[in-house]
Amino acid sequence: MSKRADYLSKYLNNELSDKPKKKKHKKKSSTTPATSMNIVVETPKPLGVPSIDNNEEYNELNQQTKDNEVDVDEFAPVKLKTTQKSNKGFKRIDNGDIITTNNTTTTTPPPSSLSSSSSVIKPNKLQPNQETIYRDSSGRIINDIKQRQEDLQQQKLHEEQLKQFTEIKTSKQDQINQEQEIFKVKNGHVDNQFEDPMTSFIKDTTTTTKKEFEDVSKSKFVYNKGINIPNRFNIPAGYFWDGIDRSNGFEQMYLRKQTEYNYDKIDSKINETYEIDIGDD
């Protein structure tokens, strides 16, 4: 219990009475030595409006400003002084003459004559305007305008003759193609001419012809030791084919039927017969 009593007596008693009071140190006031000063106070001047007549300074300043001032209107436009540049003319490139505003030319002497004492420049008259120079397509100068017009007319005639000129083909194949173009049916009514047997041989112009070309990169791997068996897709045999036909013969039968059908179609148009009913008398 003694420990508990000591604990309570320590924290429950009045702390202010038990603790010793700290002494506060007062700051010492720094005393400055008093210095004696002689201050003179003047009596103020009486207030009032100064008279213009008796004020000499004001009269002198007013007189100076009146002498310096000039009667100027505040609302008048401001005038600026500009320096006008004198036009000295320009220099010609071809002969070096200097042309002034008075249409007078001053010739510049050569450098050899500049060193001489006589450096007087005499004005010369203006040269007349040069005539226009006409040139052809090759760059040659054309002096006569009539000759130029004749050349243009001849050129136009030559172009018209070229349009009317018909080219004659020399090779046999070119002549055949030219004849086909000349005798081509122009009206386009081939279907109506069913009695004409030659219509079966006329090619339809509306169908587009495919251009056949050989693929060099793929033709290297094609069978080339014998005859390729034809098929409806025109696919050649491979390079490693041994030449033995192992198919069931469907492709050959299909192609044979196609050729027979086309042949019968042409034959029926050529040898077509008509039954004519003739009345008995």
UniProtKB/Swiss-Prot annotation:
Signal peptide: none
Biased amino acid composition, Basic residues: 20-29
GO CC entries: cytoplasm; spliceosomal complex
Keyword field: Coiled coil, Cytoplasm, mRNA processing, mRNA splicing, Nucleus, Spliceosome
Coiled-coil features, chain-numbered ranges: 142-181
Pfam families, sorted: Bud13
Chain intervals with Low complexity compositional bias: 100-119
Primary residence: cytoplasm
Superkingdom field: Eukaryota
Compartments where found: Cytoplasm; Nucleus
GO annotation terms (biological process): mRNA processing; RNA splicing
Disordered as annotated region, ranges: 1-68, 93-123
Subunit structure: Associated with the spliceosome.
Entry's family note: Belongs to the CWC26 family.
Function: Involved in pre-mRNA splicing.
Name of the protein: Pre-mRNA-splicing factor CWC26
